[in-house]
Amino acid sequence: MDVNLVVLHTTVIDDRGRFADGLKQENFRVLEDKVEQKLSLFKREDIPVSMGLVIDNSGSMRDKRPRVNQAALTLVEASNPQDEAFVVNFNDDFYLDLDKDFTNSVPELKEALERIDSRGSTALYDAVIGSLDHVKKGKKDKKVLLIVTDGEDNTSHNSLEKTVREVQKTDTVIYAIGLLSEESKKSAKRAKRALEEITKASGGLAYFPENAEDVRSICEQVAHDIRNQYTLAYYPTNTKRDGTFRAVQVEVVPPRGRGRLQARTRNGYYAPGGPTGSTSGN
């Protein structure tokens, strides 16, 4: 994909939280650093994705893993049949638990999810950055990560700030499920903030269910979200290749007779070039 093209995978919902169908290009306004941009690409299709299942494998997850594994498979089964996926299990470190980069085989993903020995700490940020790196190898233009964890990061080499920055260098959409009910109030608050910052930067969502039984229905919602997005893309009017962060905003102008509509997409990107050496695309 052209590194100068900025791609925005965008979810639009109404006041009741339902997906807004039937919108056209003229219903969208895209602003970069508050300057309106002209769309070069607009589509709403159920396009296949390259997806990473990034699952906490620390000691505290031992009793939750069977339900979480089943929920992750539900996500795969409810997604586009042409999707490709990989599994990362993480504790003190992170592990790619497939014999190949990606697969669309549910039995192979099931085997990778069950290849666990729940122990150790939670290196969430390292796992997210490693998974962002791996998902770039995917053949599909659209990239997605699902993170499931039950606590705050307590052992990563990378910081939350660096992780968010790495997210903003890609157009990968990240969803997170935080099973935080057994954490102390302070720890749960820090973990919630981290997951919200990571997902918001990407245009995804963070969910915080009370228990592991709810993870399956959340995974069904995530699959539905992925399959009901609009893809918007533009060439920025600011052509400087200076590596700076550009804030992006998508506004929806509802057709007559439709109520208020709200767009959710990534909050910006890093321009190509400059000291960061980053790109705006994949």
Language model: regions and residue ranges:
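Scaffold/interface architecture of coatomer-like assemblies
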Residues: 1-282
